[in-house]
Amino acid sequence: MSSSPDIAGILDNTKELDRLRKEQEEVLVEINKMHKKLQATPEIVEKPGDISLSKLKNLYIQAKELSESEVTVSNILLTQLDSLLPSGPTGQQRRKLEGNEQKRKRMKVDTDVTRVSPSMRNQIEAYASLKGEQVAARVTAEDAEKDEWFVVKVIHFDRETKEVEVLDEEPGDDEEGGGQRTYKLSMSCILPFPKRNDPSSTQEFIPGKHVLAVYPGTTALYKATVISTPRKRKSDEYLLEFDDDEEDGALPQRTVPFHKVVALPEGHRQ
C-alpha cells in the first residue's frame, strides 16, 4: 500500500509529460509557419513596425523552455520508477541483460533521436543527409577574435554526439603541413549551401541584406552586402560588395553564384 502515492506521482508526471509534448508540438507548428512566411516574403522584416523576428525569437525561447521542462519531468519519472524497481536483477534477468548489451548499443543512437523534439529530429536527419556535400563551416573557436568560414566537404555525421566531421580539401598556404585537414564541428558551425540544381526553392536575399558568401577564386567566405539578386539579374548569380574589399577608395562589385551565398550568422565577427 505504501507504493500507492508513488504510483499516483508517476501517473501525474506522465500526464505532465504528455502536456509538455503537446505544447511543444503546437509551438513547433507556429515556428514552421513563421519559417515559411519569412522564406516566402523575406522583405517583410525590413518594414517598419514588423515584429516577425521578435515573434520567432519568443517562439524559440518558449520551445527551449518546454524542452528543458520535459527533460526535468523525465528525470523525475526515472527516479520514481527506480525507487519502485527491485534493487538488482535476478540471475535470469541479468543473463538476459548481458545478452542484449550489444543490441542496446546498436539501438542507442536511434533511442536518443526519439527523445528529442520533432524539430531536432528533422535537423539531425538534414545534417545526416549532407554526407559528401560541400558546406560552409566555421573552423575557429567560439572565443576567437574573428570567425573564419571555409568551404568544406562533409565526410561523416555522428548522430550520438551531434558532431559533423568535415574535410578541408584546399587548405591555405599558411596551414601547417599544407595537406588536407579534417575538423569535428558542432552542428551550429555548419551552414548548408542552397541546392545548385533547385534555385526555385532557394531563399532570395533582398538588396541591402548582409550575407556570407564565397569570395571569388577562393574557398573562404566573408561578409558581403547584396547589391542585386539573381532574379533581377536574370541569372544564377548575386552581385555583392564584400566588406574590407576596398580598391582605389571604393568597394568593387563582384558576382557570386546563388549556391555559394548563405545567411549571415548572428553575431558574426570579421
UniProtKB/Swiss-Prot annotation:
Annotated stretches, region: Histone H3K4me3 binding: 242-245
GO cellular component: nucleus; SAGA complex
One GO term (biological process): response to salt stress
Site (Histone H3K4me3 binding) residue list: 215, 222
Histone H3K4me3 N-terminus binding: region residues: 168-170, 217-220
Subcellular location: Nucleus
Region of interest (Disordered), residue spans: 85-113
Keyword Transcription part of the UniProt annotation: yes
One Pfam short name: SGF29_Tudor
Domain SGF29 C-terminal: 125-270
Residues with the N-acetylserine modification: 2
Tissue expression as described in the entry: Expressed in roots, rosette leaves, cauline leaves, stems and flowers.
Compositionally biased residues, Basic and acidic residues: 95-113
Keyword terms: Acetylation, Chromatin regulator, Nucleus, Stress response, Transcription, Transcription regulation
Phenotype of the disrupted gene, per the record: Delayed flowering. Increased tolerance to salt stress.
Primary location recorded for the protein, binned into one broad class: nucleus
Keyword Transcription: yes
Source species, domain of life: Eukaryota
Domain notes: The SGF29 tudor-like domain mediates binding to methylated 'Lys-4' of histone H3 (H3K4me).
PANTHER family: SAGA-ASSOCIATED FACTOR 29 (PTHR21539:SF0)
Similarity comment: Belongs to the SGF29 family.
Known function: Chromatin reader component of the transcription regulatory histone acetylation (HAT) complex SAGA. Involved in salt stress tolerance. Enhances the effect of ADA2B in the positive regulation of salt-induced gene expression.
Protein name: SAGA-associated factor 29 homolog A
Gene that encodes the chain: SGF29A
